[in-house]
Amino acid sequence: MDLIQQLEQEEIARLNKVIPVFAPGDTVIVSVNVVEGTRKRLQAYEGVVIAKRNRGLNSSFIVRKISSGEGVERTFQLYSPLIASIEVKRRGDVRRAKLYYLRQRSGKSARIKEKLS
């Protein structure tokens, strides 16, 4: 392990964030800290994880949801201080690491089978 990886591991340990195990296809609820002027509140963002990028401290994931009939995708940094919590609502059974094909689908064809175990 080189010096940069070691520093990243120390930083991850210092943050001591509890991050659940999730994968593409899972439905997650991400609680995001939103600052509006002087007020600070939590905003829940629920959707399907379509991609996950594992790069140590720079890890990120993309969550897609349908809002008012329009597809909305948001990229989150896994160790961002803006993320309060991540909750896995449902496990999806998929055979791909990146689910970008869901962008072209709508309705019933965009559904993901639930993992039974």
Swiss-Prot record:
It comes from the Bacteria. Keywords: Ribonucleoprotein, Ribosomal protein. GO terms for cellular component: cytosolic large ribosomal subunit. InterPro entries: Ribosomal_bL19, Ribosomal_bL19_CS, Ribosomal_bL19_sf, Translation_prot_SH3-like_sf. Pfam families: Ribosomal_L19. One of its GO terms (molecular function) is structural constituent of ribosome. GO terms for biological process: translation. This protein is located at the 30S-50S ribosomal subunit interface and may play a role in the structure and function of the aminoacyl-tRNA binding site. Belongs to the bacterial ribosomal protein bL19 family. NCBIfam families: rplS_bact. PANTHER family: LARGE RIBOSOMAL SUBUNIT PROTEIN BL19M (PTHR15680:SF9), RIBOSOMAL PROTEIN L19 (PTHR15680). This is Large ribosomal subunit protein bL19. It comes from Leptothrix cholodnii (strain ATCC 51168 / LMG 8142 / SP-6) (Leptothrix discophora (strain SP-6)). The gene is rplS.
